[in-house]
Amino acid sequence: LVPFLGRTLGGLLARL
């Protein structure tokens, strides 16, 4: 999996 997807998911979770 590309790190971009993981980073996006992490950002979204952090936003919550």
UniProtKB/Swiss-Prot annotation:
The keyword Secreted applies. The modification Leucine amide is found at L16. Keywords: Amidation, Amphibian defense peptide, Antibiotic, Antimicrobial, Immunity, Innate immunity, Secreted. Expressed by the skin glands. It comes from the Eukaryota. Belongs to the frog skin active peptide (FSAP) family. Temporin subfamily. This is Temporin-1Tr. It comes from Rana temporaria.
